Every structure is written in C-alpha cells, then in structure tokens.
Regions:
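Acidic, PIN/NYN-like endoribonuclease modules and their adjacent C-terminal/linker elements
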Residues: 98-134
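Noncatalytic, basic helical substrate-engagement surface that gates or grips nucleic-acid strands
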Residues: 1-68, 72-79, 98-100, 106
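General alpha-helical segment detector with a strong preference for membrane-spanning helices
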Residues: 93-95, 166
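Intrinsically disordered, low-complexity regions enriched in proline, serine, glycine
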Residues: 64, 95-96, 104, 113, ...
C-alpha cells in the first residue's frame, strides 16, 4: 500500500512535468523544456529487456527482487552473495545492509536535483557498523530515526522532526519508541 502511494505520487509528478513541458514547448523556453523533459522519462519494458540482455551477455547474474530492491540487495550482502549494495539513498542501511556504495558513476558526476547543472561526485563506501557506532544507535533505532526524518516511503517523515531532533529523541528515550511517537 505504501509503495503503491509512492508510485502514484511519482506518476502525478510525471504528469505535471508533462503538462509543464508542453507549456515550455509552446513558449519555446529551451531551459524549461530540458528540465521538464528529464522529469517525464520512463523506463520501458523494452529498455529493461535490453539491459538484461547486455548483463546476461556479460556473464553477470540478474536477480529479480520479489519485493523491494533495497531489501533484496541488503539480504544478498548480509549473506555474502555480494560485497556491497550500490544506491544513492540510504534506505539499504535501514534494511541492515552492511556495506553501501554511493556515487558510483562512470563520469564522476551527477545531476543536481531541480537544476540542469551537474556536480562532481566521488564514490563513497558506507559501513553500517560505522554509522551505528558514530550515532550510538542500533539497527532498530536507526529504523525509527529513518521513520522520523523520512525515507522513500514516507517522504518528509514526521513534521517538525529533522535529523538532529530525531537523534536527540532517540538518545532521550532509547528503545521506548512509543514515547517518541506520542510526544
């Protein structure tokens, strides 16, 4: 149900971008056309099949996750079937993935959100145990922190609670999560 709402929201964003793209085309506003065209991009079945064919031709395995890709890759890394999960967000850590690689890019850059500009990025290896040690949390508390500040599945998190406040609440209440959410 939560994932369905996420898909619906993404579809609505694409539809709005499609409308704005048409307006930009009518106005001959090239910058807006580029911006909104990028937001209307979709991954087609043919594109997926072509990518899978290339991966198979390279002799690499393809794993189709039964549910969430982040959960699948976290499971594979925990079982030693892969070294790390590669993602731009931190959701893999919430699933207990021991090693996460961010900013893995051939060109060493990625698009800045909401702009046509790019920023230089370097690959970053994040070890779950280091995150937990630095924050003085366990995985269960990290999950609660993610719920408080927001994830892909609850964008924005709990209104008025950012990372600092969320961490402070966890330090104050430990594992008394009911106290955190009723406060």
């Amino acid at each position: 149900e939560i994932k369905q709402k996420t898909w619906e929201k993404r579809t609505a964003v694409k539809q709005e971008a499609s409308f704005k793209l048409k307006v930009a085309e009518e106005d001959k506003d090239l910058e807006s056309m580029l911006k909104f065209a990028a937001r209307t991009a979709i991954l087609t079945r043919d594109m997926k099949e072509d990518a899978q064919a290339v991966i198979t031709a390279l002799g690499l395995p393809i794993v189709q996750a039964p549910s969430e890709g982040e959960a699948q890759t976290a499971h594979m890394v925990k079982n030693g079937d892969a070294y790390a999960s590669v993602s731009q967000d931190y959701d893999n850590l919430i699933f207990g993935c021991p090693v996460l690689v961010r900013n893995l890019s051939i060109e060493g850059r990625r698009k800045k959100t909401g702009t046509l500009a790019f920023q230089k990025v370097n690959p970053e290896v994040i070890m779950l145990q280091d995150v937990l040690t630095n924050l003085k949390l366990d995985v269960e508390q990290l999950i609660v922190l993610a719920i408080l500040v927001g994830t892909d599945y609850n964008p924005g998190g709990v209104k008025g609670i950012g990372p600092k406040t969320g961490l402070k609440l966890l330090k104050e209440h430990g594992h008394d999560f009911e106290a955190i959410f009723t406060k």
